[in-house]
């Protein structure tokens, strides 16, 4: 039997699901370095897929425990943008179906922008309901960032198309009669909170990129409103905008000068 070309071997390996496949056994016996590299790559890919699968099911334990008690609509809630000097705080509430599965799902801060965007689209398709809450810098200055974050989370829940029976929240307690569980570092421990963190992060990043187009000298599309050297220098040169949080240092100090 004629040997496959390296390219053919690469394409065949994409189709092979397990080592028992006759084609895989054939490639295992192929001594060409190029083929052996592809086989090794296949093993590493399968190992990664298995780890992602295990991690996903570990992150589903809160949801599974609630479903065993008959709870169907579970909303994961997370926020993005508590620390920046500019822009809103954005929260998301996401209700996922029982058969939801996106391997590699994690805290949005640990994912590349490309992966966040891809997961964002997949979550939008698969989710039962998504609600977003956005609180402006002006309100943040009026009621403080902690209260503004709570308000944004309550808004996100109110904007859901269904009423959740239980809330899984990343390190917060909300003044609502809906039963809730607060989970420290929940965006890495719950698939619902992780999905919410991705929706919130992509939503806010897109808003900050729009601000970057409106005020190109500030570079919002690069630092997303955080207090980087570039951002602070831009404020010194061009001044404080309406989009800046006047109650946050060093903006507060700059205004008082």
UniProtKB/Swiss-Prot annotation:
GO terms for cellular component: cytoplasm; ribonuclease H2 complex. GO terms for molecular function: manganese ion binding; RNA binding; RNA-DNA hybrid ribonuclease activity. Its EC number is 3.1.26.4. Manganese or magnesium. Binds 1 divalent metal ion per monomer in the absence of substrate. May bind a second metal ion after substrate binding. Its cofactor is Mn(2+); Mg(2+). Keywords: Cytoplasm, Endonuclease, Hydrolase, Manganese, Metal-binding, Nuclease. It catalyses: Endonucleolytic cleavage to 5'-phosphomonoester. HAMAP family: RNase_HII_B. This is Ribonuclease HII. The lineage of its organism: Bacteria, Bacillati, Bacillota, Bacilli, Bacillales. The gene is rnhB.
